[in-house]
Amino acid sequence: MVKYKILVATGDSVFAGSANLVHLWLVGEHGEADLGKQLRPLLGRKTELEVDVPLHLGRLLAVKLRKQKGLLDSDWFCKSITVQGPGTQGEAFFPCYSWVQGKETICLTEGTALKVTDDTQNLFRKYREQELENRRNVYRWGSWKEGLILPIAGSTERDLPRNQRFMKDKDLDFSLSLVKELKNFAIKGTLDFVSRVQKLEDYQKVFPHTKTALPERVRGSWKEDALFGYQFLNGANPMLLRRSMRLPARLVLPPGMEDVQTQLEKELKAGSLFEVDFSLLDGVKPNIIIFKQQYVTAPLVMLKLQPDGRLLPMVIQLQPPRHGCPPPLLFLPSDPPMAWLLAKIWVRSSDFQLHQLQSHLLRGHLMAEVISVATMRSLPSLHPIYKLLAPHFRYTMEINTLARNNLVSEWGIFDLVVSTGSGGHVDILQRATSCLTYRSFCPPDDLADRGLVGVKSSLYAQDALRLWEIISRYVERMVELFYRSDTDVKEDPELQVWCREVTEVGLLGAQDRGFPLSLESRAELCRFVAMCIFTCTGQHASTHLGQLDWYAWIPNGPCTMRKPPPISKDVTERDIVDSLPCLQQARMQITVTKFLGRRQPVMVALGQHKEEYFSGPRPRDVLKQFQEELAIMDKEIEVRNASLDLPYEYLRPSLVENSVTI
């Protein structure tokens, strides 16, 4: 008889334990031992077993487990199983982090990461193949709207694989906070039907009380040109600003504006001319809300970077020129204050549309979902890249399914209160999909292409580059443990299938936009994996965390505009408030922004996941080094922000979530 000591860890979330007995088997290279119904898993507990096995199993390869159905059937969340005894080299660790359901038999392989080519005796081949076959049946590609990158199949969150659903603590927090915000909306919103905005200060009625000082600062300074320009550098959407290489062709300067032309050319020559072009919105059909037409424009903003780092607007053009029509009106800082303010408000509303749809939803949420589904379909749990990426997929599929069903669905939030709802938002997403280049997801390339490297007042650029470098070093160190040469990368068939699954299937053939169809070297692999992790963490955080800060004061980021853009510069405050959202629309914007933009109480910061997918000290040391570098960056940002008038925190590692969860 051979003695084994087994330690089974159950999750500590509500309902993670089970009333059912669990059947266990030990699988070794010389045979398999049935341990019988040995275990009743308890919430948050580690259950210890000592068993005698009548045969020598040799090297321990796997643990199989199956939950026995009783009178009361309940799922069980198994974290991991640890085995001590012969063939374990002291101790063998079997990561699980999965729900055990029904009578399904789950096979947990030992946590040492292995590529196909490492398994020279084919000991794990059948486990890899069976796991991927099962996963491809469970994780199927779906289709939401034609021309958009692919989601997970499933109409509602109940259709998702159990392992991708919210744990009970997350589910309760999400549901209760949503009920709270909707209750407040219902109570206070009834008064909005009898109230009308008479002046800009009336939006104070819906201005929320927040835990940070920035919304109040925005409310007090939103009219200032410096704050208007600052938002393109470090606001909720820092993804549109780029340095001008030439004057845009659409910028038609009519006679009498020679001085403006001279100023623009001077800044262009000095390398201090920047632009934000919203042409993606041109021709988008605007929404009709409660039988009232809403309006959308496609502005162009030209800005100059001052020696002190301030970015100031020089010219605003609200619409592109049309053939056979007079040149569109240009707005200048020297115009009457109300005309200039209304032009800036139109820009802020346009920025709201592209921020929420292109930068946040598409580039953050939907891109992370493509990566997660492709990984689940292509890489078995033994694979080192699966183990590296798995912590960054937590809750992404469910939050995206909820967004498709409630935010951008028919009669969802966009249809109810946003100027691009009722189809325009889908048009924008389809157009933006064609702009998804590989370089734009890698900050060193993206920031270089947009001319933002070295711009000291772009705190987003500085922090994005720093975070990318830390993530890249983490990936490189981990890859070096398992890929000794470029040949190892090229000859890894599962890795190549995964890369093609992302680019050709999930991204609908994005190889023409620079995404790789294959990975030919360690450098290419590291860049691709770093892109995946940054997308699921920093990329999303940079466009998510600022929502409440910058949109709490409605005139600074209106979700819709109720009047067409001005055709003259004879503008009054009445014209402005009649253009901005009514109080009902404004309150709904605040309700959604508060709910989605709040700091999450159930949150795992970047690199702080507790799941251990790797076994052995070397991967653990690499993760520890990653955490140490993140802590240094976090502290340095804290020190920097203490001396800043406007602190920038959206890429602070302690605030960046480890995955897209909200």
UniProtKB/Swiss-Prot annotation:
GO terms for molecular function: arachidonate 12(S)-lipoxygenase activity; iron ion binding; linoleate 13S-lipoxygenase activity. It comes from the Eukaryota. Changing residue 453 to L: In strain: FVB/N. Its EC number is 1.13.11.-, 1.13.11.31. The keyword Iron-sulfur does not apply. It catalyses: (5Z,8Z,11Z,14Z)-eicosatetraenoate + O2 = (12S)-hydroperoxy-(5Z,8Z,10E,14Z)-eicosatetraenoate; 1-O-methyl-(9Z,12Z)-octadecadienoate + O2 = 1-O-methyl-(13S)-hydroperoxy-(9Z,11E)-octadecadienoate; (8Z,11Z,14Z)-eicosatrienoate + O2 = (12S)-hydroperoxy-(8Z,10E,14Z)-eicosatrienoate; (5Z,8Z,11Z)-eicosatrienoate + O2 = (12S)-hydroperoxy-(5Z,8Z,10E)-eicosatrienoate. It is an enzyme of class 1 (oxidoreductase). Pathway: Lipid metabolism; hydroperoxy eicosatetraenoic acid biosynthesis. PANTHER family: LIPOXYGENASE. It comes from Mus musculus (Mouse). This is Polyunsaturated fatty acid (12S)/(13S)-lipoxygenase, epidermal-type. Belongs to the lipoxygenase family. Residues 2-114 form the PLAT domain. Binds 1 Fe cation per subunit. Fe cation binds at residues 360, 365, 540, 662. Expressed in epidermis. One of its GO terms (cellular component) is cytoplasm. Keywords: Cytoplasm, Dioxygenase, Fatty acid metabolism, Iron, Lipid metabolism, Metal-binding, Oxidoreductase. Its main location: cytoplasm. SMART domains: LH2.
